[in-house]
C-alpha cells in the first residue's frame, strides 16, 4: 500500500486540502466526498503550466501546492474536448470561455458535421513529492446549438452529456450532475482507491 493510501485509509477523520478558488468546484467536491473525507479549501495562486495534458497540468499544480502547504492536497484540472477540433479547446477551455463565453464556444463548431465532445477531469492527490496519485473521470456528449440552463458554472450550459437525458449540465439539479459529471466520476475513482 502506498504511503498516500495509508494517509486516507488509516484514520476515521480523513482530511485533505482541496486547492481551488472556484466555489462551484469546491461545492461539488464536498458534496461527492461528504461523509468520507473532511475537505478543507485553500485558494492558492499557482502558475499553470501550458500543456495539452490535463494529467501533466494537474500533477504539476499538486506538487506546487504540496510544496506550499506541506500537507496532503487534492488538485483538479478539467478539459472540454471537441472531436471536430482534434480535442481543442481541451485544458485551455477556461481561457476560451473567459474570452468568448458560451456562445463563442458553440460558434467554434460552425461549419463542422459533428458536435461530439467529451469532458474529462483529473484529480491529483499528493501526500508527498513521492506519493502522487491521479484519478480520471470522463463524460461523452455533445455541444448544443445554443446555451441552455441557469445552473452550474463555466461551460455547463453548452455541454449535453450522453447520460443527461437531453439536458445540459446547467439544466440539471446538482444531485443529477454530481452523479454523472466527469468530476464526480473522478471522485468515485478516488474513493474506490482509498476504499472510502
From Swiss-Prot:
Q: Which UniProt keywords apply?
A: Cytoplasm, Hydrolase, Magnesium, Manganese, Metal-binding, Nucleotide metabolism, Nucleotide-binding
- Would you say which domain of life the source belongs to? Eukaryota
What's a single GO BP term from this record?
deoxyribonucleoside triphosphate catabolic process
Q: Which GO terms describe its cellular component?
A: cytoplasm
Asked if the record carries the keyword Membrane, the reply is: no
Q: Where in the cell is it found?
A: Cytoplasm
Tell me what reaction this enzyme catalyses: ITP + H2O = IMP + diphosphate + H(+); dITP + H2O = dIMP + diphosphate + H(+); XTP + H2O = XMP + diphosphate + H(+)
Recall the GO molecular function terms of this protein's record.
dITP diphosphatase activity; ITP diphosphatase activity; metal ion binding; nucleotide binding; XTP diphosphatase activity
Q: Which residues bind Mg(2+)?
A: 48
Stored CDD domains: HAM1
Concerning HAMAP family, the annotation shows: HAM1_NTPase
Task of the protein: Pyrophosphatase that hydrolyzes non-canonical purine nucleotides such as inosine triphosphate (ITP), deoxyinosine triphosphate (dITP) or xanthosine 5'-triphosphate (XTP) to their respective monophosphate derivatives. The enzyme does not distinguish between the deoxy- and ribose forms. Probably excludes non-canonical purines from RNA and DNA precursor pools, thus preventing their incorporation into RNA and DNA and avoiding chromosomal lesions.
- Protein name stated in the entry: Inosine triphosphate pyrophosphatase 1
Q: Which organism encodes this protein? A: Trypanosoma cruzi (strain CL Brener)
Organism taxonomic ancestry = Eukaryota, Discoba, Euglenozoa, Kinetoplastea, Metakinetoplastina
Amino acid at each position: 500500500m502506498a504511503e498516500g493510501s495509508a494517509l486516507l485509509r488509516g484514520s476515521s477523520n480523513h482530511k485533505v486540502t482541496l486547492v481551488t478558488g472556484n466555489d462551484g468546484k469546491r461545492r461539488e467536491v464536498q458534496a461527492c466526498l461528504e461523509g468520507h473525507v473532511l475537505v478543507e479549501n485553500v485558494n492558492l495562486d499557482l502558475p499553470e503550466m501550458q500543456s495539452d495534458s490535463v494529467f501533466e497540468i494537474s500533477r504539476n499544480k499538486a506538487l506546487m501546492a504540496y510544496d506550499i502547504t506541506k500537507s496532503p492536497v487534492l488538485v483538479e484540472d478539467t478539459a472540454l474536448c471537441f472531436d471536430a477540433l482534434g480535442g481543442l479547446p481541451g485544458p485551455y477551455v477556461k481561457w476560451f470561455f473567459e474570452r468568448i463565453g458560451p456562445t463563442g464556444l458553440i460558434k467554434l463548431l460552425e461549419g463542422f458535421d459533428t458536435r461530439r465532445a467529451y469532458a474529462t477531469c483529473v484529480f491529483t492527490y499528493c501526500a508527498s513529492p513521492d506519493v502522487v496519485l491521479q484519478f480520471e473521470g470522463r463524460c461523452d456528449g455533445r455541444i448544443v446549438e445554443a446555451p441552455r440552463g441557469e445552473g452550474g458554472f463555466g461551460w455547463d450550459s453548452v455541454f449535453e452529456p450522453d447520460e443527461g437525458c437531453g439536458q445540459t449540465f446547467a439544466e440539471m439539479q446538482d444531485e443529477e450532475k454530481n452523479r454523472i459529471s466527469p468530476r464526480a466520476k473522478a471522485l468515485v475513482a478516488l474513493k474506490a482507491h482509498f476504499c472510502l
